């Protein structure tokens, strides 16, 4: 008889589940726009069944996408178990925009999808295929819970997209479904687990102190983070036009900026693309505040921005003060540059170039890692997350990826 399988969620992931409410969501979403390519039909739509066939063929490579939640009896802690009754039709769905669907109509549809809570009784993801977009294109909106999206074996986009325009259609294989424990078995396994942490803790402590240099670096890093956090707690964020309580509704919009223009700004002011984006954002926010008939000199705006470390596997949320009160664009750039240079000097950070230089595009996973760092933004009012785009054309079995956008969960 096969051994039962389950995986206990980390305390951090369990917190994401507990923090959700009728107004607060803990999932991220990606919007991808493709040319119809080989999926185009004579009626002007897309061949949804062919897309379904491709996704279904890739699922055996992504066991995480078949995992659903269970609760440990009495304890209540969530665990992952394989869904014995997994049905792709509950996760891959088809809809249509009124032709020719505009960007604005796509954003309204994405807003409704982002506002809807994922079904806790099933694996925590879904994907919408929207046909009817102007130019004969179609869109995919992939929504995934933060407790799932960062895990290995859950990056659906990395599996679906390829640099090979003529990639062959994968053949579907039978997925391995591992037996889930009964409530009694799950409770028994957790009782055993609770008796073993003391032995594991001793082993971790011995490994930690066997490397004094590593121990010193970790202690210094924790001390820096504590001091920084205390500093911001002493001086909390002031009032801003973005203060207020969350509603159950969402409104999503897209503003495109040519990357070449951003690069020119970066070359002029120095620093990184991220610095240039912050400079552009600060100027735009100053004009926005002025449009509300509010003096920018009275506004204290801070952005919480996740910074990926050099491995690209973890991120910390840093608070950047956006000097909207400063009228001079050059001075705003200098003030922002001082902050970002200090951050980079204190931590080994990943560059956008290094994160995007691999053979596969992992934007969805990097986006999820960054979103996880945005637990709460009480020290700021805005979130700014940089996730590099693909450095080469990507295709969904011949359909070219033309545009991609991310949706972060709102925090209060």
What is the predicted function of each stretch?
Residues 1-13, 31-46, 50-412:
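Soluble acyl-CoA-dependent acyltransferase catalytic core bearing the H(X)4D motif
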Residues 11-23:
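Acidic, low-complexity proline/glycine-rich segments
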């Amino acid at each position: 008889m096969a051994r039962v399988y389950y995986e206990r969620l980390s305390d951090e992931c369990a917190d994401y589940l507990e923090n959700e409410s009728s107004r607060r969501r803990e999932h991220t979403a990606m919007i991808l726009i493709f040319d119809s390519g080989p999926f185009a039909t004579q009626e002007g739509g897309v061949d949804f069944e062919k897309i379904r066939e491709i996704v279904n063929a890739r699922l055996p490579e992504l066991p995480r996408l078949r995992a659903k939640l269970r609760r440990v009896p009495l304890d209540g802690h969530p665990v992952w178990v394989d869904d014995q009754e997994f049905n792709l039709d509950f996760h891959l769905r088809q809809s249509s925009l009124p032709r020719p669907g505009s960007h604005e109509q796509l954003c309204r549809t994405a807003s409704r999808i982002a506002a809807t809570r994922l079904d806790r009784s099933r694996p925590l993801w879904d994907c919408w295929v929207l046909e009817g977009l102007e130019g004969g294109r179609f869109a995919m909106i992939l929504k995934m819970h933060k407790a799932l999206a960062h895990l290995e074996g859950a990056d659906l986009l990395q599996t679906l997209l390829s640099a090979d325009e003529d990639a062959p259609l994968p053949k579907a294989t039978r997925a391995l479904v591992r037996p889930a424990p009964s409530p009694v078995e799950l409770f028994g396994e957790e009782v055993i687990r609770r008796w073993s942490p003391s032995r594991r803790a001793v082993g971790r402590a011995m490994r930690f102190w066997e490397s004094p240099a590593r121990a010193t670096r970790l202690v210094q890093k924790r001390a820096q983070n504590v001091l920084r956090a205390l500093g911001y707690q002493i001086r909390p964020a002031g009032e801003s036009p973005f203060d207020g309580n969350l509603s159950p509704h969402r409104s999503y919009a897209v503003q495109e900026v040519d990357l070449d223009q951003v690069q020119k700004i970066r070359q002029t002011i120095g620093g990184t693309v991220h610095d240039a984006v912050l400079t552009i954002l600060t100027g735009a926010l100053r004009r926005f505040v002025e449009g509300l008939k509010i003096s920018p000199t009275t506004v204290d705006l801070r952005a919480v921005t996740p910074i990926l470390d050099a491995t690209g596997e973890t991120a910390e949320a840093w608070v950047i003060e956006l000097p909207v009160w400063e009228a001079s664009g050059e001075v705003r750039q200098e003030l922002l540059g001082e902050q970002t240079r200090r951050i980079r000097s204190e931590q080994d950070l990943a560059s956008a170039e290094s994160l995007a230089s691999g053979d596969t595009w992992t934007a969805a996973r990097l986006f999820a890692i960054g979103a996880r760092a945005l637990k709460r933004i009480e020290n700021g009012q805005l979130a700014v997350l940089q996730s590099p785009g693909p450095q080469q054309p990507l295709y969904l079995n011949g359909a070219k990826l033309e545009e991609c956008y991310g949706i972060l969960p709102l925090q209060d």
